[in-house]
């Protein structure tokens, strides 16, 4: 039998990437609203550019948020603390343009008290379809390429913040990982691309010499530390700052906007995406909460050993609590002789995908031990700190199919 061979690539960006700066500010604002009023309705968008931050959107809340203080703290924590970056926490201008949510939308989301079932009282915040995915490629049940890509830029940030080596690093960075597959199994890393912002070369060192130093440091302190040695061979291509100098970056180099890194936020292109971004949205927005729930369904199906891969789609109508449709596809990897229809039937009985039920199950209105700002860099999935990553339905799924 001939082997199926192909290459697959995913990318990530660091917390200092301009789009991620925007995401983190939006989610930090959301966190503060929810801390004051867990019923807050928030849709917060952020725009960042040279020396400027604009925060806008719609809210319904009893809370009062100091956008200036929140944004400056986020920017400081990321590491934009030097004037030479042309985007600095204490000196950048910050404009808040938050205003009240449309009563038409609010009327559809918050239903009347006389409805008997509390989970039917909260309708979906909008129409749309959301996807969840899980697979057996990594211990986190995530696709390997996106996991590696996330880990690489996260390691760069950890080194930069620790300040003991590679002290020339600046906050902006990107990564990209290409894996070679045989029969749907990742066999090796074919290519890694890392572009990291850095200080100018020291006096007496040429640009070419400086880039060689950076390349060597990234390979030794980042790539070799994170990527398993058996996944890298003499044919693996390593592209470190392939364009050369990368001094101008962050919001000064490129304008950043909330919600522009939706594939980085999810599965690196290994699964479909419904198109709705996450950051800055309270959990009544199913773009966010239902995507988290769909991941929870897919992960539990795979963790229960029912399939090696699982894609879940759920869709909603605005103001309606129950999903319009649910779809499960195990990509011909279902086990124990099960069909996708059988798995879907049991999953629909076990997982309540009404928005209010999702919010209650995960505590999305009152985050405990985590916050939304944490989701806004390095991925919303494959990280155990988040409640939707729990495999707490495995026993029920196994019992439903009478599996030991």
From Swiss-Prot:
UniProt: ATP binding residues: 17, 172-174, 245-246, 254, 260-261, 277, 281
Binding site for Mg(2+): 19
Nucleotide-binding found in the keyword field: yes
Record's catalysed reaction(s): L-methionine + ATP + H2O = S-adenosyl-L-methionine + phosphate + diphosphate
Chain residues that bind L-methionine: 58, 101, 254, 285
Cofactor(s) the protein requires to work: Mg(2+); K(+)
Record EC number: 2.5.1.6
UniProt remark on cofactor binding: Binds 2 divalent ions per subunit.
Keywords on record: ATP-binding, Cytoplasm, Magnesium, Metal-binding, Nucleotide-binding, One-carbon metabolism, Potassium, Transferase
GO molecular function: ATP binding; magnesium ion binding; methionine adenosyltransferase activity
GO biological process, one term: S-adenosylmethionine biosynthetic process
Subunit structure of this chain's protein: Homotetramer; dimer of dimers.
Function: Catalyzes the formation of S-adenosylmethionine (AdoMet) from methionine and ATP. The overall synthetic reaction is composed of two sequential steps, AdoMet formation and the subsequent tripolyphosphate hydrolysis which occurs prior to release of AdoMet from the enzyme.
Name of the featured protein: S-adenosylmethionine synthase
Naturally occurring in which organism (per UniProt): Chlorobium chlorochromatii (strain CaD3)
């Amino acid at each position: 039998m001939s082997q199926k061979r192909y290459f697959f690539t995913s990318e990530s960006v660091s917390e200092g990437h301009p789009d991620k700066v925007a995401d983190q500010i939006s989610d930090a604002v959301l966190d503060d609203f929810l801390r004051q009023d867990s019923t807050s309705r928030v849709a917060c968008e952020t725009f960042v550019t040279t020396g400027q931050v604009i925060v806008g959107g719609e809210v319904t809340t009893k809370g009062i948020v100091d956008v200036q203080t929140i944004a400056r703290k986020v920017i400081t924590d990321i590491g934009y603390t030097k004037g030479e970056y042309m985007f600095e926490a204490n000196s950048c201008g910050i404009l808040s343009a938050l205003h009240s949510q449309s009563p038409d939308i609010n009327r559809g989301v918050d239903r009347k008290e006389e409805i008997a079932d509390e989970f039917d009282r909260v309708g979906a915040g909008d129409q749309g379809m959301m996807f969840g995915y899980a697979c057996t490629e990594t211990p986190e049940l995530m696709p390997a390429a996106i996991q590696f890509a996330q880990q690489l830029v996260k390691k760069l940030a950890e080194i930069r913040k620790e300040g003991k080596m590679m002290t020339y690093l600046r906050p902006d960075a990107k990564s990209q990982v290409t894996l070679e597959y045989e029969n749907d199994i990742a066999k090796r890393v074919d290519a890694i691309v890392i572009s990291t912002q850095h200080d100018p070369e020291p006096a007496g060192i040429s640009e070419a010499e400086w880039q060689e130093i950076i390349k060597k440091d990234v390979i030794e302190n980042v790539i070799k530390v994170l990527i398993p040695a058996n996944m890298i061979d003499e044919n693996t291509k390593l592209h470190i700052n392939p364009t050369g100098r990368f001094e101008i970056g962050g919001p000064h180099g490129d304008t950043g906007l909330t919600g522009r890194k939706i594939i980085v936020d999810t599965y690196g292109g290994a699964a479909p995406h419904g198109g709705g971004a996450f950051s800055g949205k309270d959990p009544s927005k199913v773009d966010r909460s239902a995507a988290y729930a769909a991941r929870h369904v897919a992960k539990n199906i795979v963790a229960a050993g029912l399939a090696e891969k699982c894609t879940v789609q759920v869709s909603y109508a605005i103001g309606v609590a129950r999903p319009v449709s649910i779809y499960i596809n195990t990509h011909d990897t279902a086990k124990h002789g099960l069909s996708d229809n059988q798995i879907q039937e049991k999953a629909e009985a076990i997982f309540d995908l009404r928005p209010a039920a999702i919010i209650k199950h995960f505590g999305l209105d009152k985050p405990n031990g985590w916050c939304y700002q944490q989701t806004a860099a390095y991925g919303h999935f494959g990280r155990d700190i988040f409640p939707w990553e729990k495999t707490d339905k495995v026993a029920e799924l196994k019992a439903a199919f009478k599996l030991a």
